[in-house]
Amino acid sequence: MKHQLKLGVRTWLHLNRIMYTVGRRLSGHMEHYDLTLAQFGVLAHLQAAPHISQQMLADRLFVTKGNMVGLLNRLEDRGLVERRPDPEDGRTHMVSLTEQGAALAARVVPEHEELVAACMAVIAPEEQRTLHQLLHTLDRALGPT
């Protein structure tokens, strides 16, 4: 007799597969700009919060401090972001987009949103709202990352 996975496990596997598939599509698009998805995440977060600490950015992107340093080094080398010591706490670095980084973010963020929307378009808007509510409930129940 074949083992039947529990519904929760099957649902989790579907979520993983969807995230992988959509992630690959988004990564392919970001290659046109010579960006990884992680680098895009930095630009998008800095567009929304123009001047935040390096640690807060790492927390929001779910990456380690070491990974964040590498991401920022590469983006800084390309002239897309800049880091400055926090005037109130010299141990902390504040990160912001450069003019060039802001211009790139202004192009790629809307394109990213359109690609994600196109992936989701197979689901009716009301079903998308329901899915959003269900995932929000699960996220809250699981607690902080």
Regions found by a protein language model. Give the residues of each.
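Charged, amphipathic alpha-helical coiled-coil/dimerization segments
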Residues: 23, 73-136
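The alpha-helix within a helix-turn-helix
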Residues: 58
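N-terminal leader segment of winged-helix/HTH proteins
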Residues: 1-33, 137
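Central "turn" residue of the DNA-binding helix-turn-helix
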Residues: 34, 50-51, 62, 124
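Short alpha-helical elements of helix-turn-helix
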Residues: 9-13, 33-44, 66
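C-terminal regulatory/oligomerization modules of transcriptional regulators
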Residues: 1-7, 125-145
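Residues within helix-turn-helix
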Residues: 54-55, 66, 73, 93
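Short, locally clustered residues in the helix-turn-helix/winged-helix DNA-binding domain
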Residues: 16, 44-48, 109, 136
